[in-house]
Amino acid sequence: MFARQSLRVAQPLKQGFRKYSTEAPSKGKSSLAPIYLGVGLIGLGVGLYRYNSASAEAPPAERPKVFTGGDQGWVDLKLAQIENLSPNTKRLRFEFPDKEAVSGLHVASALLTKFKPQGAEKPVIRPYTPVSDEEQPGYLDLVVKVYPNGPMSEHLHSMNVDQRLEFKGPIPKYPWEANKHKHICLIAGGTGITPMYQLARKIFKDPEDQTKVTLVFGNVREEDILLKKELEELENTYPRRFRAFYLLDHPPKEWTGGKGYITKELLKTVLPEPKEENIKIFVCGPPGMYKSISGPKVSPTDQGELTGILAELGYSKDQVFKF
């Protein structure tokens, strides 16, 4: 699948003692004191060496976790920083009370967010996948695109620094282990890139993990491509193992990538064949994309049947995971 002709479909579709033992003793004075001193210093040195060696070999202390799951309940975090990524997308940084703590998330997992609109009877609860590293101490980052009539995304975009939001988790999605699959394919649309990036970053961060990754990422406009800088960095750092294909519904004139929706022809060209061993295809995006590519999930715990383009291409239900 990483042959040159396949990888270029997106165009246009596209790392002392001797002295003290031989000298004659002075009259009336003992010559043993220097020896005792030397032995003491050597003993001290051996002790320090053993202490330092033990310290170097000891595993680092485990950092406290903000989210522990189970019966923990909701955790209130303060918004510390806002970054505008595009006209409709922001990166929001929420800080932990303990600056040494980590989120407690694992790959792949998400968090629930909650707020209660004024005058509403029930709170709004929505899942989000942080884009910050799971081992990052002190804070977590969300990348949030605002959607019309989307109560949580509108609320998040209206927040100011020092305001607070409730979180709960982690919510497990797909348990990843190094080299669990030989080749994975990530089919994403819009903000569906967030769990895909979480997974890809985990793979390439681990020097023992040699998994190949193919990303197919669809968006409306070029400015809608979230995490483009981070994805390009992965491409440049791991050119033999990571390939990304971008498609736009409304591309600019100079655009050299794919145009329009993610099609059967494109996926047939860039994905590994269904008969290949130990592959996995992940799908995440808006409802229309699920319907076209894989069919929808029935519920958070029920993947539903595999339909759409992937079924037509011959992939099995076990080869596909819907975030």
Curated annotation (Swiss-Prot):
Kinase in keyword set: no
Name the top EC class.
Answer: oxidoreductase
| Claim: Oxidoreductase is one of the keywords in the record | yes
- PROSITE patterns cross-referenced by the UniProt entry: FAD_FR
Domain of life, per UniProt, equals: Eukaryota
- Give the EC number(s) under which this enzyme is classified: 1.6.2.2
Give the catalysed reaction(s), semicolon-separated: 2 Fe(III)-[cytochrome b5] + NADH = 2 Fe(II)-[cytochrome b5] + NAD(+) + H(+)
Its membrane topology is listed as: Single-pass membrane protein
Ranges for the FAD-binding FR-type domain?
A: 72-177
Q: Which residues cross the membrane?
A: 32-48
Provide the cofactor list for this protein.
FAD
Membership in a protein family:
Belongs to the flavoprotein pyridine nucleotide cytochrome reductase family.
Q: What is this protein called?
A: NADH-cytochrome b5 reductase 2
